[in-house]
Amino acid sequence: MKSLRELELAGKRVLVRVDFNVPMDDKQRITDDIRIRMVLPTLRYVLEQGGRLIICSHMGRPKGKRVEEYSLAPIARHLAGLLGRDVGIAPDCIGAEVEAQVAALGVGEVLLLQNLRFYGEETENDAVFAGKLAGLADVYVNDAFAVSHRAHASVVGVAERVAEKCAGFLLQTEIDYFHKSMNDPIRPLVALVGGAKVSSKIGALENMLGKVDKMIIGGAMANTFLMSQGVDVGASKVEDDLLVTARNFLQAAGERGMKVYLPVDFVVADRFAADAVHKTVPADSVPEGWMALDVGPASSILFREALQGAGTIVWNGPMGAFEMDAFAGGTMSLCRDVAASQALSITGGGDSNAAVKKSGEADNISYMSTGGGAFLQLMEGKTLPGVDALEA
């Protein structure tokens, strides 16, 4: 996979795929622009090298129709402020009018194409649509790690049709950090896995067998593992169809010498609500009709001890329903412990990153990945279609 610095960009039409799928309020104001800021080094480099910059992205799920609330016009205005230069907004992402705008684009000028997902052909990796996008570019740059696990037209189809192609700085950084953490880690390597469902993480868990030295499992998915060991977790969320899978995983981990840490206590509630009655109980003493919504203080101490001396920490998924303050304690404690560690620490996934931001520890994490699904796919030991297309 070539890097951006290897290509000649002067005077070239440089099409950069980014992920500008940022949150907005009801007045079309951006509430968090981190995804835009993360690709600024790539965009600035293209401009510094005399490229003619064309940017493409999706936003939301307009399902192949033009939906004004998903227009990228507010992004163009915001980006102009960050770059300190005008950013044109195209009326569309393909077509004669767009082709004319690209042809007229001067060196150092910027054009943002309209939302790619206004066309259903984008998510279908349609050959004709990909060909029209590719026709706008002399050079293609993928700097959208967060969508590189999707075989979409702007991610795979365009890369297959443009001879000069490379990874942007953000995509390269993401791949490098993942390689450092999982393929060539400073040991011991500790994996923290949380979130709601075992079903969405089992591929990653099984791939990490034999690769990580310790694993901490929290969040609602821990209930299924505890239940597989005969622990009654009351009305807590359990995936009954995965009890055997969970039991087999724990057995395999033991056989390979990988220590797995499960919660030993919970903060339980009588219902899933911020104002629910709640209390702390041992993991095997969840009252009938109550549900576990966070790991308890004894679990936090256990997990802190498990992290001591770690060389590398990889974290995907929260320990509880941290969006409600009553059930945020376990996740916030873990954020502080990971931040205090001397280990190389990497978080992946929207919930994990949101938790770190809530804790105020973002500056003390080595790297916060921009990709949830892409990060998880790498954790599963799979390649990313977007990266494969750059290497073809």
UniProtKB/Swiss-Prot annotation:
Pfam family for this entry, one: PGK
Binding site for substrate: 19-21, 35, 58-61, 117, 150
Main location per the UniProt record: cytoplasm
Locations listed in the record: Cytoplasm
GO terms, biological process: gluconeogenesis; glycolytic process
UniProt entry tagged with the keyword ATP-binding: yes
InterPro entries membership: Phosphoglycerate_kinase (IPR001576), Phosphoglycerate_kinase_CS (IPR015911), Phosphoglycerate_kinase_N (IPR015824), Phosphoglycerate_kinase_sf (IPR036043)
Binding site for ATP: 201, 323, 349-352
A GO cellular component entry from the record: cytosol
Cytoplasm recorded as keyword: yes
The entry's keywords: ATP-binding, Cytoplasm, Glycolysis, Kinase, Nucleotide-binding, Transferase
Catalysed reactions, as listed in the record: (2R)-3-phosphoglycerate + ATP = (2R)-3-phospho-glyceroyl phosphate + ADP
Record EC number: 2.7.2.3
Molecular-function annotations in GO: ADP binding; ATP binding; phosphoglycerate kinase activity
HAMAP family to which the protein is assigned, alphabetical: Phosphoglyc_kinase (MF_00145)
PANTHER family the record matches: PHOSPHOGLYCERATE KINASE, PHOSPHOGLYCERATE KINASE 1, CHLOROPLASTIC-RELATED
Family: Belongs to the phosphoglycerate kinase family.
Description of how the protein assembles with itself and partners: Monomer.
Protein name from the UniProt record: Phosphoglycerate kinase
Organism, as annotated: Desulfotalea psychrophila (strain LSv54 / DSM 12343)
Gene name of the record: pgk
